[in-house]
C-alpha cells in the first residue's frame, strides 16, 4: 500500500507578518467556522477518493492554525482520523505561533493526536520581532514553549530567520544560542527572502530596508551550520537541523519527491503523477462545500523529464544527496545515463561530491544551490 502525506492549510492569522506572501488573512474571524466546515467536507471527500493510501504524515500550516478555536481544530482532526488510514506511528504536526498558544491549547492539540509542534520564533530580540510584524515577544515565546513541554510534547521545531534588515552577526548568534540552549528537537533556519506583494517588498522598493550583504548572509549561514553541530543538531537539509532521529518526516516527503495531498485554500498537491492546487479565492472555496471540482486549479501532468529534474534538485537539498540506487529504482535508469555530463562538470567545479552510493552538494555547492539545480532542467 502506497503512503502519502497530508497538508492542511489554515489561512487565518491574528496579524499578517510584513514579509509573508502565503495565502492568509487577519481579521476574518467571522469566516473561520464556515471555512472549517468547507475544509471538513473536502477532507471527507478526499478520504473516500484515497481510502487505499496510508498516511504517514499530517501537517497543519498557514497562516496560523492555532488562530482557530480549539473545537474547530478538533473538528478537522476528527475528520482526518475518520476519513483517512492514518498510521499508528504517523508524524502529526501543527504550526503553532507564539501569541496564539497556551497550556490549554497545547494540551488540547495533544489530546487531538498531534505529536509534533512547529513554533515560528524567527528572532530573539523584541525589536526585531516588532520589525517583522510578529505579534509575540520573546517572553511570550518562552512562556508558550514551557506550556508546550508541560502539555507533553516531546517533538518541537523552532523556525528562525537570518539576514533580517539591519541584523548584526551578534544578534543572530544570540538568537541561535538561546534557542539551542532550550533544546528543541528540530531547528529550521531560513534566510529572509523579500517577496513581491508584501509590505517588506514595498519598503525595499522605497529604499527603507537596510538589507545585509550577500557575504554577511553566507557568514551567518556557515556559522549556524557549525554551531548547531556543536549543540548536537545534525544538518539534514539546506535549512533544517535535527537531533538524532528527529528529522521531519513531512519535509522529507517533499524533498524525496514523494506524494502528498494538500487540502484547504490554495493547498498544493502531488498525486498520481500530477501537480495541482486549490483556488486562492476564499469565498469560492467556502461556497464549494468540499466539491473539489469547483476549486481545483492548474492541474499539470508531470512528464518524465520533469520528474527526473525534480527528483534531482529536490533530493540535492538533503545533505545525504541523491542515491544511485533510489534513482534507478524510481526511473529504471542509471543517473549517469541521464545526467552524466552535468554530474561530471559539477563535480569538477567542486559543487557536487560523488562517492559509490550517490551525489550530494558540497559546502560551496550549497551556497550556489539554485545555480546547481538549474543544471538538471533538461
Question: What does each of the following model-derived ranges do?
Answer:
Residues 1-4, 24-48, 53-333:
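C-terminal scaffold of the Radical SAM
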Residues 6-9:
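Short active-site neighborhood of thiol/selenol oxidoreductases, capturing the structured segment around
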Residues 11-22:
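Local cysteine-cluster metal-coordination motifs and their immediate loop/turn environment
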Residues 333-345:
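Short amphipathic alpha-helical interaction segments
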Residues 347-357:
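A short, conserved structural fragment
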Residues 358-362:
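Minor-groove-contacting beta-hairpin "wing" of winged helix-turn-helix DNA-binding domains
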Residues 366-378:
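Short, amphipathic alpha-helical interaction segments positioned at domain boundaries
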Amino acid at each position: 500500500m502506497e503512503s502519502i502525506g497530508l497538508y492542511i492549510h489554515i489561512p487565518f492569522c491574528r496579524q499578517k507578518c510584513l514579509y509573508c506572501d502565503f495565502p492568509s488573512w487577519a481579521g476574518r474571524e467571522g469566516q473561520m467556522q464556515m471555512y472549517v466546515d468547507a475544509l471538513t467536507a473536502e477532507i471527507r471527500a478526499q478520504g473516500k477518493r484515497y481510502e487505499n493510501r496510508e498516511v504517514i504524515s499530517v501537517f497543519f500550516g498557514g497562516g496560523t492554525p492555532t488562530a482557530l478555536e480549539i473545537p474547530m481544530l478538533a473538528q478537522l482532526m476528527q475528520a482526518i482520523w475518520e476519513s483517512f488510514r492514518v498510521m499508528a506511528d504517523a508524524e502529526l504536526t501543527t504550526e503553532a505561533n507564539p501569541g496564539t498558544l497556551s497550556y490549554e491549547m497545547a494540551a488540547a492539540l495533544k489530546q487531538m493526536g498531534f505529536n509534533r509542534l512547529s513554533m515560528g520564533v524567527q528572532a530573539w530580540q523584541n525589536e526585531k520581532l516588532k520589525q517583522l510584524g510578529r505579534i509575540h515577544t520573546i517572553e511570550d515565546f518562552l512562556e508558550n514553549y514551557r506550556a508546550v513541554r508541560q502539555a507533553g510534547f516531546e517533538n518541537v521545531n523552532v523556525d528562525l530567520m537570518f539576514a533580517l534588515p539591519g541584523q548584526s552577526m551578534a544578534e543572530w548568534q544570540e538568537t541561535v544560542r538561546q534557542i539551542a540552549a532550550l533544546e528543541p528537537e528540530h531547528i529550521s533556519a531560513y534566510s529572509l527572502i523579500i517577496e513581491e506583494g508584501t509590505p517588506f517588498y514595498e519598503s525595499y522598493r522605497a529604499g527603507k530596508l537596510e538589507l545585509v550583504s550577500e557575504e554577511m548572509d553566507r557568514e551567518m549561514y556557515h556559522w549556524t551550520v557549525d554551531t548547531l553541530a556543536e549543540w548536537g543538531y545534525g544538518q539534514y537539509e539546506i535549512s533544517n537541523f535535527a537531533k538524532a532521529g528527529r528529522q521531519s518526516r513531512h519535509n522529507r516527503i517533499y524533498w524525496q519527491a514523494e506524494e502528498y495531498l494538500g487540502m484547504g485554500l490554495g493547498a498544493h498537491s502531488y498525486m498520481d503523477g500530477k501537480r495541482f492546487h486549490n483556488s486562492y479565492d476564499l469565498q469560492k472555496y467556502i461556497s464549494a462545500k468540499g466539491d473539489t471540482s469547483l476549486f481545483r486549479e492548474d492541474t499539470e501532468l508531470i512528464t518524465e523529464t520533469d520528474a527526473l529534474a525534480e527528483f534531482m534538485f529536490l533530493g540535492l537539498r538533503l545533505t545525504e544527496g541523491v542515491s544511485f540506487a533510489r534513482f534507478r529504482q524510481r526511473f529504471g535508469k542509471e543517473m549517469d545515463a541521464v545526467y552524466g555530463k552535468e554530474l561530471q562538470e559539477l563535480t569538477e567545479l567542486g559543487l557536487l561530491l560523488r562517492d559509490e552510493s550517490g551525489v550530494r552538494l558540497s559546502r560551496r555547492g550549497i551556497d550556489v544551490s539554485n545555480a546547481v539545480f538549474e543544471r538538471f532542467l533538461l
